[in-house]
Amino acid sequence: MDTFNVREYLKKDSFDIDEYLMMIGWAELLSREEEQALVEKAQQGDEEAMNLLLWSKARFVINLANQYTNKGKGVSLQQLLNVAMPVLQKAVLEYDVHNEDPLIKYAVPQMREALEKI
């Protein structure tokens, strides 16, 4: 299966969350070594590597965003994902691959901060 382009999909005016969940379900979990290699490539401008990283972390981002859907602000899951995914992308670019913590642990506080501002 071709790589699912998470960023392009989220740019749509609206999307079918069930279709989105199905597509991200195809993403393989990455080993620490695979993640580090993709981060290094993404930091060098490799768009495919960036997309693979975002795709592999999309399930986690959905779980995180879902924590903010019932805050009484009337914000849709799509809006929350449109906030969280660019933050994850920025975290990929800033992440130190020599850090002992996984990428997602580095990115979560930044995503939470952005989601809390909505």
Short names for language-model regions:
Residues 2-118:
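Alpha-helical promoter-recognition and RNA polymerase-docking modules of transcription initiation factors
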